[in-house]
Amino acid sequence: MIKPVRTMLFDLDGTIVDTNELIIRSFLEALKGVVPEGFSREHIIPSMGLTLSDQMKIFSGLEQVDHLIAAYREVNYRLHNELVKPFAYVGEVMDHLQKQGVRIGIVTTKMRLSTEKSLKFVGLYDYIVPDAIVTIDDVKNAKPHPEPVLMALDKLGVEPADAIMVGDSPVDMQSANAAGVVSVGVAWSLKGAEKLRESGAKHVIDDMRELYAFAGLEREKLAGR
């Protein structure tokens, strides 16, 4: 285990907020008539974590994908409240971490508008330091580049060695490692724990409550797991 940290950065989708089905449904509906018959969730999951633009280019084979992005966002907005929920223990853990003085930031490839919408909808927004929400709108280089992680740390006035980055995607692990931050993968990732380890995850957790140990808090909080 690393020395206790007082700053934790989190990816959003698939890490603390379960938007997996929303994302998959949005792609499938937006890409109808564009992708070959048989295109399914199994084709989508490996690229989740990349920017929406990059994913649409990969799936469609097109360079100009603005119309597909617009279609995706329409579906995503329409189904958001029906399909989005927090993962187990996320609210409990963030509440306890915040009360113990741990500062929490978000590093995501989503737009700011949709990021804040999801955080507020699932009741997590108040646990986050607002200035430390870094979205695709804020950076020139998205994950796996280190820029988003470094920007969040700069907003918090924290050195890389004093923080961890928690995520569900290879690009989260790569961005964290490139920034000099300890990378922590979540085993509930659709990509699987082994894929995160292969991508450089220094740790993989099976339960959000395992994060208490990274802040030097008592592990008895895991009771009842």
Positions of predicted regions on the chain:
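Asp-based, Mg2+/Mn2+-dependent phosphohydrolase catalytic module
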Residues: 1-8, 95, 111-112, 116-225
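N-terminal helical cap/lid subdomain that shapes the substrate entry/recognition surface
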Residues: 2-100, 116
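Conserved phosphate-coupling serine/threonine residues in phosphotransfer and NTP-handling enzymes
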Residues: 15, 108-110
